[in-house]
Amino acid sequence: YASDKSEFDLDNKIKELHSFLDTPFKVGDSDYRLAFNIGVVYFPGHGNEVDLLIRRAQVSVQQSKLQKSFYVEYKSGLDEQYMRRLQIIESLKDAVADKELHLVLQPKINCQTGSLVGAEVLLRWQSDKLGFVGPDEFIPLAEQSGAITELTNWVCRESAKLLQSWHEQGRTLKLSINLSTVDLLSDALPLLFE
């Protein structure tokens, strides 16, 4: 977008476009809505070269998807955030095979007796390439990239092994596992618990 136009004009145009594209339309008996995201860059403020402007617009589009908003204006630093997300998504593909994941248990204590009754399973990732990657960073990207199913499968398998080990030791403790919305909506979810 040319920087001689006002940001107010652009904001109004984007809102008009959003209103138009967000209006449901019919095909046969079904209503449909278009999903879209817009990345905003300014010439020359965000770059003078076409390739750079296009890349920054694409980065802004990806950021708008992450923020679940229909448009994001490019800001300094988005390139680095975008590259970090790509590295995480790429590294996640091998995290299970490379044995970079581990479980951490948050104890559950009976307040009346003070006895241990179980634990909540928390997933942690120590990447050889990226170092420690927090679950607040990698889980949303796993959901977006489709890698969450493999992570959930791994967590369930490892949790089952832990429960089996406790059972063999005569312990009757419970484990709680956090599931993603993606997992809850999956037809494969019941298969995890067979």
Regions found by a protein language model. Give the residues of each.
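Active-site core of bacterial EAL-family cyclic-dinucleotide phosphodiesterase domains
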Residues: 84-141, 178
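Cyclic-dinucleotide signaling modules
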Residues: 1-86, 90
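Output-coupling edge of small sensory domains
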Residues: 23, 41, 106-108, 124, ...
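Catalytic core of bacterial c-di-GMP phosphodiesterases, primarily the EAL and HD-GYP domains
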Residues: 13, 81, 111-120, 145-194
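PAS/PAS-like sensory domains
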Residues: 19, 70, 98-104, 172
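Nucleotide second-messenger and two-component phosphorelay signaling modules
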Residues: 26-29, 66, 98, 110, ...
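PAS and PAS-like sensory/regulatory domains
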Residues: 32-36, 101, 119, 173-175
